[in-house]
Amino acid sequence: MKTLLLTLVVVTIVCLDLGYTLKCNKLVPLFYKTCPAGKNLCYKMFMVATPKVPVKRGCIDVCPKSSLLVKYVCCNTDRCN
């Protein structure tokens, strides 16, 4: 009986994500990655001249400043980029 209870506890811990992990889209939005610890923002980078076509997506710790040529959009919810 103790073995069964211990097994259920272990399976529950393995199946549940006990710590919150952010998921961000990769360049192709069908695919995503789980962000490592400390990277708590998703970002999308694109050229100002072609704002509809993202150049890069992923996880980041601090949102970079946009420039005249490159724009960054950052967010902090799952797959928001």
From Swiss-Prot:
Key word Metal-binding present: no
Single GO term (MF): toxin activity
Signal peptide: 1-21
GO BP of this protein: killing of cells of another organism
Tissue specificity field: Expressed by the venom gland.
Protein's cellular compartments: Secreted; Target cell membrane
Alphabetically ordered keywords of this record: Cardiotoxin, Cytolysis, Disulfide bond, Hemolysis, Membrane, Secreted, Signal, Target cell membrane, Target membrane, Toxin
Taxonomy, superkingdom: Eukaryota
Gene Ontology terms: cellular component: extracellular region; membrane; other organism cell membrane
Main location: secreted
Disulfide bonds: C24-C42, C35-C59, C63-C74, C75-C80
Membrane-spanning intervals of the chain: none
SUPFAM superfamilies (UniProt xref): Snake toxin-like (SSF57302)
Record flagged with keyword Signal: yes
Protein family (similarity comment): Belongs to the three-finger toxin family. Short-chain subfamily. Type IA cytotoxin sub-subfamily.
Subunit and interaction comment: Monomer in solution; Homodimer and oligomer in the presence of negatively charged lipids forming a pore with a size ranging between 20 and 30 Angstroms. Interacts with Kv channel-interacting protein 1 (KCNIP1) in a calcium-independent manner.
Role, per record: Basic protein that binds to cell membrane and depolarizes cardiomyocytes. This cytotoxin also possesses lytic activity on many other cells, including red blood cells. Interaction with sulfatides in the cell membrane induces pore formation and cell internalization. Cytotoxicity is due to pore formation, and to another mechanism independent of membrane-damaging activity. When internalized, it targets the mitochondrial membrane and induces mitochondrial swelling and fragmentation. It inhibits protein kinases C. It binds to the integrin alpha-V/beta-3 (ITGAV/ITGB3) with a moderate affinity.
Protein name: Cytotoxin 3
Species whose genome carries this gene: Naja atra
Lineage: Eukaryota, Metazoa, Chordata, Craniata, Vertebrata
